[in-house]
Amino acid sequence: MPQTTKTESAVVSLAAIRTPRRGVTEYLFFERQQIFTVRASAARRAESANLLRRALREQQPLTVVLDPRRGEIQRIDTPTAKELELFNRGKIAPDVRGTARKIDLARLDPSTFNVVDLSLKVPIFRLCKKTIPNYKTAKKIFDFCAKQSCHLGGPFDITPCIPFQYVIDGCYARAHKMRQIITTKYRYCCEKVFSFANSGSDTLAVKADKWGGCCVFWWYHVAPLVRVRIKLGRFRITLAMVIDPGMFDKPVLLSTWLAAQANKTCSQNANVSMYSIQPGSAYWPTSFSGTTFGTDPNYSLTNGTLISYQNLITCP
């Protein structure tokens, strides 16, 4: 049965605390793409703010109860020893880390931006050479992934299903499951592309047209990035394309994916501050600057999140 509201308990670490001008203080967690606030009595709000500020200052994780539908932090606790043990995770080694770049969407030229080795000179691309041979194959991969969406009811070709119908959070898990499909079922290269709203009051804002048309807001987003060879007359070029069935009905150019996250009808602060292309093993960010990343090599975090979100929906 689809659910519109579900509180969840999680161990998280703070990426940043920011207070927009004349706005409500926002709390950003590495383990959640969604932006959260504290809405309570003045006394409770002050107590929570102190706990959160101390956790950020001391770089200590917290156990929180979150209400994703309202984007609110309902309770804050100290993690148990067992929770801390499970929370510890690996990070991408510096020698295989990818490229992070600031971006001005208004000045982006799609005719050149998406061309690999022209505008997109990314050293980690050299680590894998088996790129997708044509758009038809990329669409086949996209369609296979999209068919695993939990809202379709099954039967599914994979376990667990992927909750594309719930885009409020969980992009890191959806992206990692698709990366597993692309690299093991189809055996093609798959990197990850992260978008960030980590400058000033920037916010990633998307109109969820596939799931009811409501607006959703993130501080980061991630999806599989694939390199697709395209024939143009006598020439062949390789384009960077993104597989993101939560947002689109087909593979799209990297520039299209980025632009869709700056929907001004959803927020006047809608803007992509920067993007980062990382190895497919990157799971979620571990720095607010978007330069270090955690991993999930055995897909345990991935599958747990997919199962937790499988019955949730985006728009009420």
Q: What is each residue range found by the language model?
A:
Residues 32-43:
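A short macromolecule-binding patch
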Residues 65-100:
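OB-fold/S1-family single-stranded nucleic acid-binding modules
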Residues 141, 157-201, 224:
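Cysteine-centered nucleophilic/redox motifs
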Residues 204-316:
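His-Asp-centered catalytic microenvironments across diverse enzyme cores
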Residues 91-170, 174:
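Secondary-structure boundary elements
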Residues 7, 23-24, 71, 219-221, ...:
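Extracytoplasmic
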Residues 45-65:
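Short nucleic-acid-contacting surface segments enriched for D/E, G, S/T with interspersed K/R
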Residues 2-30, 88:
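Structural detector for short beta-strands of small beta-barrel domains
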